[in-house]
Amino acid sequence: MLQLKNLTIRHKKDLRPLLEDFSFTLNEGDKAVIISEEGNGKSTLLKLIYDKTLVEGYVEYTGEIIKRGIIFGYLPQEFPPEYKDIPVYSFCCQSEGFLNATPKQLASAASRLQLDSAFFYSEQPCGTLSGGEKVKLQLSLLCLTEPDIYLLDEPSNDIDIETLQWLEDFISTCPNPVLYVSH
């Protein structure tokens, strides 16, 4: 269970609030979406939940984030630019879940994401993947880490209609809680 109690997030620079007195509980099997306009702190909230060091340089917060022992699977809004020139296989090798996976687990993750398991071993540079392929690649690696909760930051950006339908199915059938943000 993830619980936020009376969470307020402010920019350090001008103390402008991004979120005020926000309380929220995500229980087993829950699916929740936070929708608002761009620039209103949705990504900051997910980063804060996942790893406060990702945002401590530009925001401060008060309140409680209760996440005892939870393993998060975090999908960032943008594919990390530092990986654009490396092959898919090299990107996969940076995931502990991938390195520890059995061939059966890899095949299962690939099937769940409608990928061929050979995709994980591709020499294709990550920067040449479509938006949908990047989302599926990252989600497949998250699945292999077996997180307790998925945190998805704008997962529907830069994907086609077919991949969007697949993403909706993935979220709705995922047995784990999912918190995602959109605009």
PLM regions: where:
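A short, flexible loop at the N-terminus of ABC-type nucleotide-binding domains that lies
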Residues: M1-D21, E28-D30, E56-E60
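Walker B catalytic motif
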Residues: E154-P155, D160
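Catalytic Walker B motif of ABC-type/P-loop ATPase nucleotide-binding domains
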Residues: Y150-E154, L167
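ABC-family P-loop ATPase nucleotide-binding domains
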Residues: R10-K13, G69-L141, T145
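Helical segment within the ABC ATPase nucleotide-binding domain
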Residues: L164-P175
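ABC ATPase nucleotide-binding domain signature region
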Residues: K31-V33, E37, S43-T102, S182-H183
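Pre-Walker A (P-loop) beta-loop-beta motif of ABC nucleotide-binding domains
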Residues: D14, F22-E37, I70, P175-N176
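Pre-signature/interface helix of ABC/ABC-like ATPase nucleotide-binding domains
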Residues: K5, F24, Q124-T128
